[in-house]
Amino acid sequence: MSGVGRRGTGPWPSSNTDAVVTAWLMSRLSDVEGEERSGMARWLLEHVSGQGKGERMVADMRWHESQLDRLAVMADRLNEGEPIQHVLGESWFDGLRLEVSPSVLIPRPETEELVAAMADKVAGLEGAVRVADWCTGSGCMALAMKRRHPHAEVVGYEWSMDALEVARSNARSAGMDVHWIHADALHAEQPETPFSVVMSNPPYIPASERTTMHARVTAHEPSMALFVPDDDPLVFYRAMASWCAQGALVPGGWLGLECHTDKAHEVAGFLEGKGGWKHVDILHDLQGLPRHVVARRALP
């Protein structure tokens, strides 16, 4: 539930000192799992005050009534299972502070690893570089690539108009020039000028896995960005590989894909079996799981 227009309710802290307010907030987060509670409390306190714990201690901070009201509303939303990123209205990704909403996936650390890998590929290319980010969502990957390689031309493709608005807003806030296109990844037209790099974090979770996932994800993040049919889990990978092979990706260009950890080997095998691809590699994430597939389009 959004916090717009919502007011906090008691009980309230016995005083407005930082120590008392911190203890009050911790106790108020009663439905948040114990190991997460202290971290979420810290994020809320820093977000509302604009200061870290040390800064608040040095300043001997006293919390205002309006700030306590915001903390109470935010704590209630967390207790109701809303993601912390939605409660704060923002998420950090590869050094960028990004707006997030229920219209987009919350950026994950694993996706930062794909951006880093593809940024390394961009660094090894000569001449003008064009990068496409399919299923861009919040624009996190496109904007992170633009931050790392300001001279690259970056294009973000997205089917959801609501998500595109979030991406555009993030680009404006970051002061970055990224071109955003409304398009369907499964029926994509060829670009006028081919790309040097294509990357994507497409939907890849089989629909049958919904019941095994945390409600914090399934109830608050867009299903269209998460799930694929059980009988065709590689549908987006096939579409993007075909789009690239038809000319959207230059020969010698790179394709980078985030995958379900149970499907990365299958995606890699599909590219190897299809032909026209070289250097097909599976990259493991920081948890040691097969998360990304990177491949190079073969030269003629």
Report each predicted region and the residues it spans.
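Phosphate/oxyanion-binding loops and surfaces in catalytic or ligand/nucleic-acid-binding neighborhoods
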Residues: H47, Q51, R77-G81, K121, ...
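Short helix-terminating capping/connector loops at secondary-structure junctions
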Residues: G34-R37, L125-A128, L249-G252
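SAM-dependent Rossmann-like transferase core, predominantly class I methyltransferases
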Residues: V58, W63, V73-S169, H182, ...
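N-terminal auxiliary segments of SAM/dcSAM-dependent transferases
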Residues: S2-S91
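Short, solvent-exposed loop/helix junctions and linker helices
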Residues: S15, A19, R62-L68, L105-P109, ...
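S-adenosylmethionine
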Residues: R148, A152-E153, Y157-L299
